[in-house]
């Protein structure tokens, strides 16, 4: 039975819009302001790659950022690699994607782990990380802090050989030397050398040894309760996949009628971006699309703050120690004034005395008036 009533939608009148404008403050646009300013300024990210030669570090970096940073690289022979000392090489490139600019710095460590005796071969690398902290601390403590250049290492991809049965002593030594200074993300290199069951066993072994030796690798932050289920699922997959088993390739091959980046073998094709073949996509999503900002935050709020607190503590301790010394400043004997100096001092004293008398007389006259 129809009631015969009609419902009319109420249109917003100019008066209603004015009331809404009065209630609207405007700070809801702050995220947009920050976004515009950040995009205009651009971003910077410093990534260190470490591991023995021949594990595909350069190829993986090229695959991650689609940028060739090693055009002029000279490949060394096995004998040259054995005699090579650890170097620190920086490659910087400006990348732009959809109007967003990224200044990417890759810190390479050729010569690491290639010598017969690798005792403390990570020392030049730890020194480099400390030098960047020190430079930033000096710039931050200076007068001109407007354009501080951030060269701190935000992440270190550490490549683990797939041919061993877990971590080697040099792997443990490197990660323990740097785990309090930089975010370490361990990777199993050249995962196409292993079958899936071998990869799972190697991952379990590496996780056990990381816990056994007390190594602190980068920990993914917990998801907020208001995150959507897709993001939570992606986060769970990232945590379960670590350490990532990766493959890199600069070659485009044809697979099932499509051109993909991968490697061609007699038994088939390994696709770099196929998640059934390796964890490259998970690593790229973590490093670039979801956790790049968190890596920078942890570097600034944890690793750099620890270094800064240590520096301030050392400075305070040194000042306290100096103040407790009996004679921190040597007391030099004062020179004996000669006759001319004594005469000059007497003249100055006489002049001061006359000025005081004049001031006293002027003050007395003002009181009498």
Curated annotation (Swiss-Prot):
* Annotated region (G4 motif), positions in chain: 189-192
Task: Identify one Gene Ontology CC term for this UniProt entry.
Answer: cell cortex
Post-translational modification here is noted as:
Phosphorylated by DYRK1A.
Residues the record lists as binding GTP: 51-58, 85, 111, 190-198, 248, 263
| InterPro entries reported in the protein's UniProt record | G_SEPTIN_dom (IPR030379), P-loop_NTPase (IPR027417), Septin (IPR016491)
Of which family is this protein a member?
A: Belongs to the TRAFAC class TrmE-Era-EngA-EngB-Septin-like GTPase superfamily. Septin GTPase family.
- Quote the PANTHER family the UniProt record gives: SEPTIN (PTHR18884)
The protein depicted here goes by the name Septin-5
Q: Which organism is it from?
A: Rattus norvegicus (Rat)
């Amino acid at each position: 039975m129809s009631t015969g009533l009609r419902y009319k939608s109420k249109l917003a009148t100019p008066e209603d819009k004015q009331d809404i404008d009065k209630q609207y403050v405007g700070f809801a646009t702050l995220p947009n302001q920050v976004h515009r300013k950040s995009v205009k300024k651009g971003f910077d990210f410093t990534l260190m790659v470490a591991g023995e030669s021949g594990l595909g570090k350069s190829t993986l970096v090229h695959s991650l950022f689609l940028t060739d940073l090693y055009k002029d690289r000279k490949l060394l022979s096995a004998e040259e690699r054995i005699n090579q000392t650890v170097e620190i090489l920086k490659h910087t490139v400006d990348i732009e994607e959809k109007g967003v600019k990224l200044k990417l710095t890759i810190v390479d460590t050729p010569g690491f782990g290639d010598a017969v005796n690798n005792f403390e071969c990570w020392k030049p690398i730890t020194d480099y990380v400390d030098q960047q902290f020190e430079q930033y601390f000096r710039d931050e403590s200076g007068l001109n802090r407007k354009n501080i250049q951030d060269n701190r290492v935000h992440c270190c991809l550490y490549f683990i050989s797939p041919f061993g049965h877990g971590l080697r002593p040099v792997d443990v030594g490197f990660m323990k030397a740097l785990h309090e200074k930089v975010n370490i993300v361990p990777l199993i290199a050249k995962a196409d050398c292993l079958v899936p069951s071998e990869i799972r066993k190697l991952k379990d072994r590496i996780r056990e040894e990381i816990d056994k030796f007390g190594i602190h690798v980068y920990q993914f932050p917990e998801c907020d309760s208001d995150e959507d289920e897709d993001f939570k699922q992606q986060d769970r997959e990232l945590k379960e996949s670590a350490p990532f088993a990766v493959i890199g390739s600069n070659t485009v091959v044809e697979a099932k009628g499509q051109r993909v980046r991968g490697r061609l073998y007699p038994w088939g094709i390994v696709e770099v971006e196929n998640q059934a073949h390796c964890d490259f996509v998970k690593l790229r999503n973590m490093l670039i699309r979801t956790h790049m900002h968190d890596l920078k935050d942890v570097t600034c709020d944890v690793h750099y703050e620890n270094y800064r607190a240590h520096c301030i503590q050392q400075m305070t301790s040194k000042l306290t120690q100096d103040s407790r010394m009996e004679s921190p400043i040597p007391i030099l004997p004062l020179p004996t004034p000669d006759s001319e100096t004594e005469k000059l001092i007497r003249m100055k004293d006489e002049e001061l005395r006359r000025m005081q008398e004049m001031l006293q007389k002027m003050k007395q006259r003002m009181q009498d008036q």
